[in-house]
């Protein structure tokens, strides 16, 4: 209730709802998160995947870069705050994230995809599905506001031939 955290050393059973709140405040998020080690410098809002070294990297749908997603290595979520290379980074696996500076203006209700390429050096979800041969298509979530997304990765990854 005070904004802190509670640790449960055993199983927790919930008999009611778990409510995720949406916020208009820049940088706010709510949902299921996990802490990983960053394999490169990352910015809030960037889509990431787990690399073979166990660290998270920018996830791209182009099929050729070191961070390229594929059926065996999909994007897992979105970074909630900037992180330096080789540092702890919080990844939103499912939930809401508002980011005014790093997100473009999204169309409310639109499906968001793992980006084919970085935009202004940022690897944020994009409105257009990749469409080139060798690219991979993966839904990463949905736009619920011009600068707020619902992260809900679909782990189905389709390759364009």
Predicted regions and their residues:
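Glycine-anchored, exposed beta-strand/edge motif detector
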Residues: 16-161
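Beta-strand-rich receptor-binding modules of extracellular spikes/adhesins
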Residues: 1-14
């Amino acid at each position: 209730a005070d904004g802190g955290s509670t640790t449960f050393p055993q199983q927790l059973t919930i008999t009611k709802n778990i409510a995720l709140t949406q916020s208009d405040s820049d940088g706010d998020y709510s949902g299921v998160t996990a802490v990983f080690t960053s394999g490169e410098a990352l910015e809030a809002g960037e889509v990431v995947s787990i690399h073979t070294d166990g660290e998270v990297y920018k996830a791209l749908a182009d099929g050729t870069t070191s961070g390229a997603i594929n059926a065996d290595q999909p994007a897992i979520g979105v970074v909630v705050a900037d992180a330096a290379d080789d540092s702890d980074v919080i990844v939103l696996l499912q939930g809401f994230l508002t980011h005014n500076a790093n997100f473009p203006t999204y169309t409310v209700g639109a499906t968001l995809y793992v980006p084919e390429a970085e935009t202004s050096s940022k690897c944020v979800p994009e409105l257009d599905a990749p469409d080139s041969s060798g690219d991979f298509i993966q839904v990463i979530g949905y736009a619920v506001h011009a600068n707020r997304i619902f992260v809900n990765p679909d782990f189905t990854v389709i390759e364009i031939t």
